[in-house]
Structure formats: structure tokens, C-alpha cells
Amino acid sequence: LLTVRSGHLSLVIDKENWSMRYERDGELLTKSGWRDLSYLKTDWKGFAYDKGSEDAYMRQQLGLSVDELVYGLGERFTPFVKNGQSVEIWNEDGGTSTEQSYKNIPFYLTNRGYGVFVNHPEKVEFEVATEQVTKVGFSVKGESLDYFVINGPKMKDVLKRYTDLTGKPSLPAQWTFGLWLSTSFTTDYDEKTVMSFIDGMFERGIPLSVFHFDCCWMREFHWTDFIWDERVFPDPEGMLRRIKEKGVKICVWINSYIGQESALFEEGMQKGYFLKRANGDVWQWDMWQPGLAIVDFTNPEATKWYQSKLKMLLDMGFKTDFGERIPTDAVYYNGADPVKMHNYYTYLYNKAVYEVLEQERGKEEAILFARSATAGGQKFPVHWGGDCWSDYESMEESLRGGLSLTSSGFGFWSHDI
């Protein structure tokens, strides 16, 4: 036997059959038996035809004890206890009524007082007491697998150690914990409409901390150019001043997609600030608006360029929407694997915006209203639960998502009503 120790945690390896036991002060936490750590080929035709790592996967199965319950794996709107669920760690824009998630975190913890973090940015597939009801399985494509087993002994100790590894959020300012009011899907509004919303809250005795302008503060199909639509907001500076005089903070909707009609598109294209196709063309699609491009945050100059546009709006906070629909066939400035970047892109996006606020306003006042996330994204608070319906069933879904996310290392979370 080979024993590796770290504090109260030990890994005991049987060198004959490569089974493993994870123990805390001699007590078994979880184990990997014979063939639980596997190298799998999905289309193997024999040694003569083997093509190396193509269609290869690494899989690990770790044992569950009697009555052991699994939590976490990001913001999931499915049942809070994850036993019996198949989970894909792959960011999608699926709302709160599906098994998809905006914030996929390859980390789970159990009521036995330990956690497991699979250290891969790409897709990780979990089988939580499904393929075998006494095991949690997880697999990644390729020929290597990197994961951490994190000791407690209490569940909150697991989260502390996990965030020691991946980062901790700062404490948001007190005003951020108040009620936020949004234009949401109201697409035809002007200053008069906005003021009627705000005044209507005060007239009803409802305290209001933040007013949020959703996408239509900019001209339609010009998302994102960071320019107020002068047709309905001819005096944005004056309007913002009048809102602040009421003691209300301001948040505006942004994303990292630049539509072809945006004033920024030509500049970004000429300077190489967008994701590209293999032939060197700008990667574009029509999912949100015609011909949109996506800012390449692996390019330091593109990041500075995007941040410079935000600095013009620094009297406001930012709702960093989207960040999930990231292509897997794009070419990045730094040569990054686009499959691994699909989930990780949102980290760079939110980091770029948060850094501007932190530099200009200080850590105490830096605040996002972000929808997408990956492991480590908790360092850029705060996150919200995405698109939901205004009914009790959807509230239940959202609350399950928030509980799962805060079981995955995120300290702050909000949701729509």
C-alpha cells in the first residue's frame, strides 16, 4: 500500500489493483475500486486501427455510503439533492425550467463532510448515483483527469477550503442587498416611463435601492455600443442625475456581443478584437441579433478596448448578461482550445468588467449583476438566477438554483420575482 497524507486527509493506494481509499483520521470518506478509474474509448476498433486520444475519455467513480447525499454542481434548477441525476457541466441559456444551467461548476459536496472539484474547464459529465446507485461518476474527454478531494469535516469547512483554492468574493456594499427594479422586457420606454416606475414604488411605500435599464436603453440592433438611444433618452446625463437625487443607484444592461450595426463593430473588426473563424474571418451569427461578433478577451488589447468603453458609463453599474452561447469552432487570439473556452469565456468576460469597477470605484463598491459563471466566478459578485416566470413554480425552481449555487462556493446570489 502507498499512503499520501495532507493534514487529516489520507489517500491509500493499493498498488496491485490501483484501488484507492480517501480517509479522514482513518475513517473512510469515499473510495475508488477496481476499474472505477478507467480509460474509455467510444469507437475502438482494435489496436491496429486505434487513433490515439481520439474518442478517448477518462472516467472516475467514487463511492457513496448509505444515506450519503450530494449537493452542488452549480446553479441547477432540478431537485436540490443531486442523487439520481445526470449532470453536464456545459453553460447554456436555458432559463430556470430546464436541466440546463447558466452557471455550471464541476464541484460537489456531500453530507459526509467532503467535496470533489474536477479541475477541467471543458465539459465534465457527472452521473450521481445513476449508472451505479452507490457511486458518483465523472468523465472528461482526453487522456488525463485532474480532481481534488477536499476535506471538511463540516460542509461549511469544505466550502471554505474550496474557495481557498478557487477564490472568494468580496463583501458587496450594503445598498446592493436592497430591492432592484428593472425595465425587464419592456421594450418601449423613455424617461417618463422610468420615472413612473421609480415614483410608483415610493408612492406605495416600497424602498428601492437600484433601478436597472435593460437592453432597450440602446438603439435596437446596436447592441452593444454603449450609446444611449437619443430618440427616447435625449438627456441621459440629466435623467441619471434626477434618479440619483431620489437616492437610487443605476444599473445598465450590457453583453460581450457586438452587433454589425453597432458603432463599435468596424473598429473591433479592423483591430482583430473579435473571435475568428479558421479562415481569418470574424466569427458571426444571428442568435441574438443579425451578424453579431464576440469580443475575444484572450486578447489583452481587446480587453482594454472593451473596458475603455465601460469607463464612459462608470456612473452606473453593469448587468453582465449572456456569456453562455460561446462557439466551439472559433479561433482565439491566444490559441486557446475553443471547447475548453466555452465555459471559461464567462470568467474572462466578468473579470474584465469587474476589474474596471474595482479600479475606478474600489472593491467595496464594485458590483456586477451577472448571469453566467464557471468555477472561480464567485470572485466577481453578484450573480442572478436568469430568466424565470413570475409564478410560484418558477420561484421554486429559482430557489433550488440559488441553493445549489451557494453550495458550489458562491457567497452571493439574487433572482427575479
Q: Model features per residue range: what roles?
A:
Residues L2-Q174, S182-F185, E191-K192, S196-E203:
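Catalytic and substrate-binding clefts that recognize carbohydrates or anionic sugar/phosphate headgroups
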Residues S32, P207-I417:
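Aromatic- and carboxylate-enriched substrate-binding clefts and catalytic-loop regions
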Residues F47-G52, I89, E99, D188-I198, ...:
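Short, charged low-complexity intrinsically disordered segments located at boundaries
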Residues S170-S184, D281-I294:
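N-terminal small/glycine-rich loop or linker at the start of catalytic domains
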